[in-house]
Each structure stands twice: as structure tokens, then as C-alpha cells.
Amino acid sequence: MRTQSITKITGKDTLNQSFKDRILKFIFKVGKNVTVGHMVMIHGCTIGDNSLIGIGAVILNNAKIGKNCLVGAKALITENKEIPDNSLVIGSPGKVIREITEDEKKAIIENTKHYQDNWKKYSKSIF
């Protein structure tokens, strides 16, 4: 995670798979149990609890991703866009195509837990 001159708030049990944020003057806030995929670019936005941001997604200034959201790989969330809770978002620009199912909500949480468990397992052998 890289930032420059930005307020950064990251929630408990949030997984970052190498995202970068270099924008000034915006608050960057990530909720609890969030998975941020590889090569994601995030600029001064808010991501709600229990959300998954897919590989290569881009989330621009002042965008707000609700709780329990699934943002698809390579999705582009434009400036000031607000994504409601429980949304599946795909495309460029990103569009809500439907609410996520209860099974998808569970899968997002299980995905985050899987990475947390792996981190705990492998960090013991590294440190």
C-alpha cells in the first residue's frame, strides 16, 4: 500500500493485495473484512465493510462503495459515484447490475477469511 499526503483509514481484517493511492486532499477509508485484489488503483474513496474489489479495478476520487459489494475485475468506478449496499458492479464505467445474493455475501466473507488464515499461517514462518 502506498500513499502520499492522504488520510488513510483501514478497517480490521482488511486484505490489501498491493493497491496504490496517490491522490491528495481526499479521505481514503476501507471498512472491515474488505478484500482488495491485485493491481487495483484506488483514489481517495470509501469502501464499505465486507466488500470485494476485483483484480485491476479502478475507483476514483470521492467514490463510495457500500457494504457487502462485489466490484468486478477491471471495473471503473468514476468520480463521486455512489454504489449502494449489496451491489454487484461490473464494466467501464461500472454499473450496478443487481443485488448480490446471500451466497455471494457469504463467499466474500469466506474469501477474506481464507486470506487472513493464510497470512497468519505464513507470517509465523517468516517472522
Question: Residue locations for each model-derived region?
Answer:
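C-terminal segments of enzyme domains that contribute to small-molecule binding surfaces
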Residues: 10-24, 30, 35-36, 40-41, ...
